[in-house]
């Protein structure tokens, strides 16, 4: 993928609806230290969304979701895999579902234990493992090291579909992906574009 990027993203970018942020992040460059790539898949979550961790209010686990916009909300899924979200308006966030790896690929392969490029970051848990995102980063600001986030100068073509791996609000079309990307966690259905 050959494209140019804007300067780093200001915190104000995140101080809006998570649906808008989730779409705008498609095609953005995201790095943690030297490992990173292009965001190719996201999902949006609102505080009034039954599938959201914020739906029942603030708890110690989801405290970062109610904190400042432009910070990470990191949690463990099923007690196994870390998942990374970008906090938007209070109680809303964007889940990073997949990245197309571009930098630090050898390091990501080592962390993931695979040489298959398409499997390095094709899912929230895989992405966090490859990029060494852990619960210690919960609440960390995205505009400070080790993070780098830059938006594409040109809007990407986006596919839209239902979110994955949830049991509530399953029909919300709040999953977004870079159209035609081979690096998404699950292909978008033809009727969901």
Swiss-Prot record:
Stretch forming the signal peptide: none
Pfam families named in the record: Pur_DNA_glyco
Answer whether the UniProt record assigns the keyword Secreted to this protein. no
Give the record's keywords alphabetically: DNA damage, DNA repair, Hydrolase
> Looking at the keywords, is rRNA processing present?
no
Q: What is its EC number?
A: 3.2.2.-
Give the matching SUPFAM superfamilies. Answer: FMT C-terminal domain-like
Record GO biological process:
base-excision repair
Q: Which NCBIfam families match?
A: 3mg, PRK00802.1-3
Family classification: Belongs to the DNA glycosylase MPG family.
HAMAP family associated with the record: 3MGH (MF_00527)
Q: What is the protein's given name? A: Putative 3-methyladenine DNA glycosylase
Q: Which organism is it from?
A: Agrobacterium fabrum (strain C58 / ATCC 33970)
């Amino acid at each position: 993928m050959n494209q140019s990027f804007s300067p780093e993203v200001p915190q104000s970018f995140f101080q809006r609806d998570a649906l808008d942020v989730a779409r705008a992040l498609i095609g953005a460059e995201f790095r943690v230290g030297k490992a990173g790539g292009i965001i190719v898949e996201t999902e949006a979550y609102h505080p009034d969304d039954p599938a959201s961790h914020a739906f029942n209010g603030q708890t110690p686990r989801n405290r970062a979701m109610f904190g400042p916009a432009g910070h990470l909300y990191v949690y463990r899924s099923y007690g196994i895999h870390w998942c990374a979200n970008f906090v938007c308006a209070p109680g809303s966030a964007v889940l990073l579902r997949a990245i197309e790896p571009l930098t630090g690929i050898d390091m990501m392969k080592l962390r993931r234990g695979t040489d298959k490029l398409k499997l390095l970051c094709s899912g929230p848990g895989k992405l966090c493992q490859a990029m060494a995102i852990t619960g210690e980063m919960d609440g960390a600001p995205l505009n400070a090291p080790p993070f780098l986030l830059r938006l594409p100068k040109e809007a990407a073509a986006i596919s839209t579909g239902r979110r994955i791996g949830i049991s509530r609000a399953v029909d919300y079309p709040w999953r977004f992906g870079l159209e035609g990307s081979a690096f998404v966690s699950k292909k978008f259905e033809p009727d969901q574009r």
